[in-house]
Amino acid sequence: MLPRSLGHSTSELSPPFDGPNGVERYVSETRSLLRKGYEKYLRRGVPFQMRNPVEELGAQVVLPPKYLDEVKRAPTDLFSFEAYSEKAFLLNYSRAPRQTEAAAHIVRVDLTRNLGKLITFYSDFAIFEVCLPLVLIRDLGALVTDLWNESALYLDKTYNSEWQTKQAYEVVCGFVARVTSVAMVGAPLCRNPVWNRIVVETTMASFGAAQAIKDKYSARWRWLAPWSESIQKDLRRIRKESIELLKPLYEDRKAAVSRSDDVQGSSEMFRDTLYWLITSNQKDRSLSGITESQLFLSLAAIHTTSATLNSFVYDWIAHPEYHGEILAEVKETLAQVQLNGGKWTLQHVAMLRKLDSFMKESARINPIGFVSIQRYTLKPYTFKDGFQLPAGVSFVFHSDGVHHDADNYPDPEKFDAYRHLHLRETVDPNRFHFASVSDSALGFGAGNHACPGRFLSAIIMKFFLIQFMTAYEMKYEHGGIERLPNHDNSNTTAPNRTVNLLVRRCDGTSNNA
């Protein structure tokens, strides 16, 4: 079935069908259906509507890029991501962790601020200047060095010189959970296996609860779900374990704030989201309230970063033609880090221009989602050209279509690892970084509501790839280098989960600082 085009409102539909209209088709063929809609409608600036397998959201409206500016400027009481998530994941019934403004703020401001002092005299750093007020910038790479040291320590303790067989996602997810936790709770809790299990389980428990509700209750009876022990037990266990682990850290940070007349002074002691949440304007700053925000941050960060990194690993294996030049760039950067006493700064991260471009191209060709900027309308809205969206409608932008539009990216099906580096050199040095967002780069969203954790995520993934380029060996257990097909599911996709990797540490090498 082709997507259905819209006229001036969502009630004006044309119904040309060319195939079955069952839910299964919209689960397994979403990417191709969206591509058809992009070519037939979105390229001409026309919205269209197609079935959404998530029944709670109703049919989804797919908007063309010309509406991006209006959506980016719209207030959250008009177009809401929180309301979209609430319906998509049944948050009112599952009681899964929710986003809070404080959690988003501390990632957007406090966390990114502590990634390093953003030097302004290199064009490579201009992207950070655009995204952050300069007055908030401090700490010369302190957190970046912490992330690097923990990444080296984790891998050194996990792998030895003997080949180990591991499922590919397990390799990356364990790394991401451990290193992300440096920014969430710091050492030593980031090394606690129970904590690392919790941050991995939170997403699966939340999605599992939503699916169990759909399976057990019709829409009329879902109000019973919060009292269902079978549905709530995993999330209750996770909350209980998290509170027990976080309590000593919570009390330490509260005491430090109480002792210090200067919050700035106590911030030198702690560089983690737990501390920043305690000192934030979050209404509920009790231990349970802070724990809830911490669980949301893990839900938002761990599996999206892991899936993206998993995809990078497959593309790295599939494209050995780029290994030599990127490895040379990495070694040059590591040499500069050593000259700085082993301390990383964002200057060093910005030297990895070829690696950054490789990652952005991998994410363009093999994204983890086909749409972005998902919103739910809380009020009716009429766009400048007269197109009307009523209240109670979910809409998205087709990021995968934008990223495969030949007007944006010539020869769009070709994997060109240096495509974005060339664009930085010839078009705009500030627009084509991995973490940058623009009207032609929608993977992280758009505007003020773009993913606030993308800078942290980018650094963690770069550190994994650097470690494996220089101190480890990694290859497919089944042999060869060809990337296996992704697993598509509705608007999302995932790198093939059936793949096993052979991993070992190279003899006599270590990047541990």
From Swiss-Prot:
<dbReference type="GO" id="GO:0020037">
    <property type="term" value="F:heme binding"/>
</dbReference>
<dbReference type="Pfam" id="PF00067">
    <property type="entry name" value="p450"/>
</dbReference>
<dbReference type="GO" id="GO:0004497">
    <property type="term" value="F:monooxygenase activity"/>
</dbReference>
<dbReference type="GO" id="GO:0019748">
    <property type="term" value="P:secondary metabolic process"/>
</dbReference>
<comment type="similarity">
    <text>Belongs to the cytochrome P450 family.</text>
</comment>
<keyword id="KW-0479">Metal-binding</keyword>
<protein>
    <recommendedName>
        <fullName>Cytochrome P450 monooxygenase CYP3</fullName>
        <ecNumber>1.-.-.-</ecNumber>
    </recommendedName>
</protein>
<keyword id="KW-0503">Monooxygenase</keyword>
<keyword id="KW-0560">Oxidoreductase</keyword>
<feature type="binding site" description="axial binding residue">
    <location>
        <position position="451"/>
    </location>
    <ligand>
        <name>heme</name>
    </ligand>
</feature>
<feature type="region of interest" description="Disordered">
    <location>
        <begin position="1"/>
        <end position="21"/>
    </location>
</feature>
<dbReference type="GO" id="GO:0005506">
    <property type="term" value="F:iron ion binding"/>
</dbReference>
<dbReference type="InterPro" id="IPR002403">
    <property type="entry name" value="Cyt_P450_E_grp-IV"/>
</dbReference>
<comment type="function">
    <text>Cytochrome P450 monooxygenase; part of the gene cluster that mediates the biosynthesis of a tyrosine-derived cytochalasan acting as a fungal signal recognized by resistant rice plants and leads to avirulence in Pi33 resistant rice cultivars. The first step in the pathway is catalyzed by the hybrid PKS-NRPS ACE1, assisted by the enoyl reductase RAP1, that are responsible for fusion of the tyrosine precursor and the polyketide backbone.</text>
</comment>
<dbReference type="InterPro" id="IPR036396">
    <property type="entry name" value="Cyt_P450_sf"/>
</dbReference>
<comment type="pathway">
    <text>Secondary metabolite biosynthesis.</text>
</comment>
<dbReference type="GO" id="GO:0016705">
    <property type="term" value="F:oxidoreductase activity, acting on paired donors, with incorporation or reduction of molecular oxygen"/>
</dbReference>
<dbReference type="InterPro" id="IPR001128">
    <property type="entry name" value="Cyt_P450"/>
</dbReference>
<keyword id="KW-0349">Heme</keyword>
<keyword id="KW-0408">Iron</keyword>
<dbReference type="InterPro" id="IPR017972">
    <property type="entry name" value="Cyt_P450_CS"/>
</dbReference>
